[in-house]
């Protein structure tokens, strides 16, 4: 057995967890995550978090502002790793919280929860640097295949990492997708994590990202009407003010990585939704006094450490 409370406490202190423990945590997490639907039904009150991208100090700031888990019910919209210095600590803490409080934290999959993307944008190299091998990267990227794709809040707000797909008119179509695999380059599963709203278009158009689609207000309105929903909530795009509201308040983007990549000088936000479905974007700046990363010797963190 592993003492999750002890591991969570150590993670809050930014300690690196042993490779053998991470392997065990990931095996436990698969059992929990595989029970979740492709569309997880959630209820208010709830706090929604956008991209984190390995900015661990800012994740701790989110828990300080929004309240600690499990006292606050959290929905994370994906993109936990890459670009920031502490992707390992970030995803390890979130997985531990999911294991400890499975009904109080929901983790969606973002486009960076992918083997291909993480080999390019930092997570893979961070694992090599901190552990001396790619085993931890493999454990976590295997877990990414189990993360759910979307959620609804009070059956009126549709939540996803990226956006909509021309292959999906009804939310029930998401339920039948085979999510337990690496993202394909195209198709509905890719669209959900890659697509973006675009006020300059009305329907679907090819995305400049090279994956997913851009979509306009007509598409958003049709999707909401067809599914008897009121709002779409997503992440995936940097917002200089921490959030953006589009299409006559039918769609919101929440971005939760302040001073993105430690140089963009943007604000961030979390979205707090109350039982009356009122929405409050709690805007915050980067956590103060962020440290330069210190990497422990690989031999030290790969030792057995079962508690």
Curated annotation (Swiss-Prot):
Pfam family, one: Metallophos
EC number annotated for this UniProt entry: 3.1.3.16
Cofactor requirements of the protein: Mn(2+)
Reactions catalysed, as given in the entry: O-phospho-L-seryl-[protein] + H2O = L-seryl-[protein] + phosphate; O-phospho-L-threonyl-[protein] + H2O = L-threonyl-[protein] + phosphate
Entry coiled-coil feature ranges: none
Enzyme class: hydrolase
Binding site for Mn(2+) 1: 51, 53, 79
Cofactor detail note: Binds 2 manganese ions per subunit.
Gene Ontology BP annotations: asymmetric protein localization to old mitotic spindle pole body; negative regulation of septation initiation signaling
Keywords of the record: Hydrolase, Manganese, Metal-binding, Protein phosphatase
Record protein name field: Putative serine/threonine-protein phosphatase C22H10.04
Organism in which the protein naturally occurs: Schizosaccharomyces pombe (strain 972 / ATCC 24843) (Fission yeast)
Lineage of producing organism: Eukaryota, Fungi, Dikarya, Ascomycota, Taphrinomycotina
């Amino acid at each position: 057995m592993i003492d999750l409370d002890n591991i969570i406490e150590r993670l809050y202190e930014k300690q690196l967890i042993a490779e053998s423990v991470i392997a065990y945590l990931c095996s436990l997490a698969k059992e929990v995550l595989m029970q979740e639907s492709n569309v997880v039904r959630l209820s208010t009150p709830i706090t929604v978090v956008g991209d984190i991208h390995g900015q661990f100090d800012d994740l701790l700031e989110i828990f300080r502002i929004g309240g600690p888990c499990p006292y606050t019910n959290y929905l994370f919209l994906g993109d936990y790793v890459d670009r920031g210095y502490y992707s390992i600590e970030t995803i390890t803490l979130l997985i531990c919280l999911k294991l400890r409080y499975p009904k109080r934290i929901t983790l969606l999959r973002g486009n960076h929860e992918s083997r291909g993307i993480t080999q390019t944008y930092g997570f893979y190299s961070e694992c090599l640097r901190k552990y001396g091998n790619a085993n931890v990267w493999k454990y976590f990227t295997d877990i990414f295949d189990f993360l759910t794709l979307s959620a609804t809040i009070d059956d009126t707000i549709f939540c996803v990492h990226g956006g909509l797909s021309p292959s999906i008119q009804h939310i029930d179509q998401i339920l039948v997708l085979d999510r337990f695999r690496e993202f394909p380059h195209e198709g509905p599963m890719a669209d959900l994590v890659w697509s973006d709203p675009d006020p300059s278009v009305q329907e679907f158009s090819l995305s400049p990202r090279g994956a997913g689609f851009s979509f306009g207000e007509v598409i958003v309105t049709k999707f909401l009407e067809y599914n008897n929903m009121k709002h779409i909530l997503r992440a995936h795009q940097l917002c200089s003010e921490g959030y953006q509201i589009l299409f006559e308040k039918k769609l919101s983007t929440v971005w939760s990585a302040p001073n993105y990549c430690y140089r963009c000088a943007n604000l961030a936000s979390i979205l707090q939704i109350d039982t009356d479905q009122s929405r409050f974007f709690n805007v915050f700046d980067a956590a103060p006094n962020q440290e330069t990363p210190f990497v422990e010797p690989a031999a030290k963190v790969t030792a057995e450490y079962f508690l």
